[in-house]
Each structure stands twice: as C-alpha cells, then as structure tokens.
Amino acid sequence: MGLPWYRVHTVVLNDPGRLLSVHIMHTALVAGWAGSMALYELAVFDPSDPVLDPMWRQGMFVIPFMTRLGITNSWGGWSITGGTITNPGIWSYEGVAGAHIVFSGLCFLAAIWHWVYWDLEIFCDERTGKPSLDLPKIFGIHLFLSGVACFGFGAFHVTGLYGPGIWVSDPCGLTGKVQPVNPAWGVEGFDPFVPGGIASHHIAAGTLGILAGLFHLSVRPPQRLYKGLRMGNIETVLSSSIAAVFFAAFVVAGTMWYGSATTPIELFGPTRYQWDQGYFQQEIYRRVSAGLAENQSLSEAWSKIPEKLAFYDYIGNNPAKGGLFRAGSMDNGDGIAVGWLGHPIFRDKDGRELFVRRMPTFFETFPVVLVDGDGIVRADVPFRRAESKYSVEQVGVTVEFYGGELNGVSYSDPATVKKYARRAQLGEIFELDRATLKSDGVFRSSPRGWFTFGHASFALLFFFGHIWHGARTLFRDVFAGIDPDLDAQVEFGAFQKLGDPTTRRQVV
C-alpha cells in the first residue's frame, strides 16, 4: 500500500474485525509489560528494611500500585511490612504478575484469531451488506460494563465486603496497612486525603455509569446530534477516548504530586511540599515537646522519635530534588540509609540554642547559617574568612546529639561542628551506604516524581492528539475538499474567482 508511518492506522479504518484485533493486542502488550515489570522489580527488590530502605527508595514503580490495592505478601516468604509469612496465598506479588502474563498470552492469541477471522457476520450491516459498527450502542455497552467494574471495586474490593480493602495510613505515613474502608458519604468524602472518599466515589460513579450505559443502550441519539458530532465516524471515538485519557492523566499527575489518599507516602515517598512546609519537622518537634511536658529528658524525648518519621524529614527523600533525567533509584543517588545519627542541637558559647537554616528545594548549594530562636543570625560558615564575624570558631559553636546512634555525644571541634551543620541543612542526619550500589551522591527523584512527569507530559501530548483528531472528524469534509453544497464542478476557468459560484463566466 505504501503508507507513510504516520498513516498506517488507516488499514483498520473500515475493518471492525481487525480494529478489535489491534486493540486486543494493545491490551496484551500493556498486561505483558505490567507482569514482566513486576517480576523484574521483585527480582531486584530488597524487602529487609521497610523503614530505611522502602520500595520508593529502591525505585520500585509497579510494586507500590499492587500494594495500595491490597497485595502485601510474596511467595518468597516476606511481607512488605517486614517479617516473614508462611502462607501468602495465590494473590501474592508473584501471583498478580503471573496473572497479568497469562492474561497477556490469552489476549495475544485472541488478537491473532481476530486478525485472521476479521470478516465476521456480527460486523456486517444488514441493510448495506458492508462492515460497520453501531458506535452509540457500543458506547452504551462500554459505559455499562465500566460502571459495573467501578461500582464493584468501590462496593466490594475497597470496603472489604469481598476483597482485602486498600492501603490506609496516618497523616505522617507511619502506621500504614491494608484494611477495609467504609464509604464516606458526608462532605468529608471530598477531602482528597480521606480514604472513605475512594469507596463512596467509586460506588457513586459506578452507579452513574450503569445508568448512563443503560440510557445509551435504550435511547438513540437524535439525527441532528448524530450528524453534528459525527457519531458514525470512528475518529470521533478516537478523539473522545483521547480526551478521557488525557483528562485522567492530568488528574492523577496532580493527586500524585500534591499527595492524596490514593498515593500514600509509605508506598510512593513523601511530596516536595512536606519538605517545603517543614511538615515532618513540625510533627517531630510536637512529639518532643509533648515528651518534655511529661518530664522526659531531652535525650529520652528524642529517642522516642520513630526512625521512620525522622527519615521522612530528610531532603534526599524530596522528589523535587532529583533531576528529571537522572536515571536510577534514590539509593543510587545519596546511597542506602543505614541508620539515624540523632538530632543535632547547636549552641554558642553563651549557651544559646541555634538552628541551622534548611536548604530550600531548588537549591543545589546553600550557605550554612545558624539562627537563634528569634531568627537572628548568630553563626555561619563564611565564604571569606578574612571578613567573617559569625564563624563557628569565633562564636564557639558546639553540637550535641539527642536520640539515634550518637545519642549523648557532643563535639566542640570546629571542623566536626561545621560538618554536622552542613548535614543539618539537609534535615535529619543519616548514615548512608554509598559503596554497595556505587552511589554517586547526586540526589534522585522518587517514583512519585517519575509518575508525575510521565503523566503530565503524555497528558499534554494527548491533549494535542484530542484537538487534532477532533478537528479531523468535525471538519472532515473541509479537509477532504468536498463541499456538500457544491452544485457545479469546480474547474479552472469556470469562475472568475476559483470556487466562487457568484463569479461564473458568461459563455459568449
């Protein structure tokens, strides 16, 4: 046929059987990729430390999505929450991966069958004897079936009525586990961080989909609307489908980047806004203050801070710190976290407590500045020593650790104090193993960042695809050069102005 690469899809334009075939093959490729990717991730995933080396630090992409839907165990005998298990059941990580691969194989065979047996009676219009599809009817069928699936997911899977529930956690991502969720029918269901909204919205949207599907199955579109929206043209279906996909992609890019109940930080890592707003730092200080109010010592109060919470309060876990094109997991960047050294508290020679100003998200380097409780600069690491007034040496800064591995240890040596002041810019201080993976020390983004970038980028491309195909189908006659109102053959010389019937030349 000699089609250019960008026109090859015209071969299925008027061939319903093979149109179905290529869509089944597409499903086979998607399911096959998902299953294969899951097996690859399981082969390289280390489940030994869910606190300091969770899935998102290791760059896992499909494991978090399986986990949020209720999969927590492996046939390898481990659980995502730590510890060992003896009976993971069929729906383990490997079971889900295998199911996708088997499904992919079946779709592959079905696609071949439909490619070979394309000329089926079901695709033949009785009136014309030509292949055709009743697109409004197919729309109704798809709407009804997707509504049933949506309702079933919300009413059974999420609620635990017939299924495991979903991943639910606290606002600080410490106590996450899979559990049934009751639908939230009040105004709280519209809070993106309330898991109950997931159940209620799926039930409501599914019900609407079922009713809308039945409506489109039982009511034919008016002729004027049918013609106006080109409902008989398969490119109309393509255009509106692309619209649905790009809209969904924009929505999930937002829920992933800004955070929601559907994207728990235990599975995808924290958001950049939690670093920008000092979210975990505030929670840590709140807990320490509560401990001091109960007459605990500073050391005791800091020792009770969960290592998991302290680890969230570290800039290396901020998804906006990694460059978009820096390949690899977070562990390949700053290394594998081994342990929390503790919280450093700096004091000057007058005993005044000093706080290191933290690095903002979009800085690669940042001056080391120590301020007191009123925000007044009291010490720094100067760029020019000759002009310094606040250097660590001049101010006599010391550091003492509370909690963590260095609990109770203090340093007054200026070089050591400056080292820990620099590290305190990055949040809580952790010992990082950069040797095992030959980590290069350059921050990487988490799967939260990759997902957002990928979906926002493709949503933009698909938006243009929607405009393109929508214009093609709505203005098909214009692009084809065929005017339905044309009553005379347009030819050179027939009119004084080409195509203008009011300027017809007079025949002498």
Swiss-Prot record:
Membrane topology, record value: Multi-pass membrane protein
Transmembrane annotation, as ranges: 21-36, 101-115, 140-156, 203-218, 237-252, 457-472
Family annotation (Pfam families): PSII
Cofactor note: Binds multiple chlorophylls. PSII binds additional chlorophylls, carotenoids and specific lipids.
InterPro entries: PS_antenna-like (IPR000932), PS_II_antenna-like_sf (IPR036001), PSII_PsbB (IPR017486)
GO BP term, pick one: photosynthetic electron transport in photosystem II
Top-level taxon in the UniProt lineage: Eukaryota
Keyword entries, A-Z: Chlorophyll, Chloroplast, Chromophore, Membrane, Photosynthesis, Photosystem II, Plastid, Thylakoid, Transmembrane, Transmembrane helix
Protein family (similarity comment): Belongs to the PsbB/PsbC family. PsbB subfamily.
Subunit: PSII is composed of 1 copy each of membrane proteins PsbA, PsbB, PsbC, PsbD, PsbE, PsbF, PsbH, PsbI, PsbJ, PsbK, PsbL, PsbM, PsbT, PsbX, PsbY, PsbZ, Psb30/Ycf12, at least 3 peripheral proteins of the oxygen-evolving complex and a large number of cofactors. It forms dimeric complexes.
Physiological role: One of the components of the core complex of photosystem II (PSII). It binds chlorophyll and helps catalyze the primary light-induced photochemical processes of PSII. PSII is a light-driven water:plastoquinone oxidoreductase, using light energy to abstract electrons from H(2)O, generating O(2) and a proton gradient subsequently used for ATP formation.
Protein name: Photosystem II CP47 reaction center protein
Organism field: Gossypium barbadense (Sea Island cotton)
Encoding gene per record: psbB
